[in-house]
Amino acid sequence: MEDNKMKKIKIAQIGIGHNHGADKMNTLRALPDYFDVVGVAESDPYWYNARHELGAYAGLPFLTEEEIFAIPDLDAVAIETDGKYLISTALRCAERGLHLHMDKPGGEDFEGFRKLCRICQEKDLAFQAAYIYRYNPALKFCMDAVKNGWIGDIFEIHSVMSRDDSKNDAYRQWLSQFKGGAFYIFAGYLMDIILLMLGAPDKVTSFLKKTRDDALIDNGLAVLEYPKATATVRVSVAEIEGFNYRRFIICGTEGSLELCPIEAVASEYYTRTLQVRMTLKHPRGPYAAGTHTVDCGPLGGRYDRQLIDFAKIINKEMVNPFPIEHELQLHKTLLEACGVPV
């Protein structure tokens, strides 16, 4: 990268309580051409004691939030607090004119999220929600195929994002604080892709269930209705080897697309080639009619593409491909499915 082409973004991280916080920091520090990481803050003693010695934060100063705000020429903040503090923290940052990369979901207070979006628009701040499936190369192939009309008019989408936390009692207890339980935490990844393809649904109907007699909704289904299509979103944290069977299926009048798994597992996570099974009624692009296995390449760095885009958006080198209006509609749809008033 040429020095005269992009200004390095001076960035700090507020919060280490989000489960993606350490990986996010590792990525920021691995992109020194784009980011100058100047510090980190965590006001919750529980999360500070649990995670401040992680290697991701080695050598970085732990500061108070006010000390971070006082850093000269600070451009942006990555907000990685525990989920219940994301919006309140983001609002304080936005009010100070800082560009925001915020982990997800965006809180159960929809009016707070709406206020955040409004401030970002008024102050011309970059706002990036950390939904990483939108950068998944196989799902990007699917979205491009849909956009280019390869599979005709969509009439059905089936999506699943599950995992097995049957023995992870601490995580199950943490999930139970949210009205939608596990569905609240994971369904937004899938809804994001659906809304990018089909837009806002006409109606959202959800079925939120428990596999155990405890406080956690650990098995959820939402049906998004459109004039000529339905899309289902399933989330469970009780599916044995559920990560292996995360999937996205799109059916159209002239073909279909199927991705399973959405992400590779374990040691192959970053390196295994993701494959889409595509069936076409007519020849499209370089593909003949019929069924194809399309190699879409490996995931690579989970957050690299997204954070590089964040820097480019701040520097006005690109327009945010996921505008505030989309983020607002996505969060509204998620909260509706979780039974949260919006």
Language-model segments: which ranges?
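Hydrophobic residues in well-ordered beta-strands that form the structural core
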Residues: 102, 127-129, 158, 259
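N-terminal Rossmann-like dinucleotide-binding module
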Residues: 2-56, 311
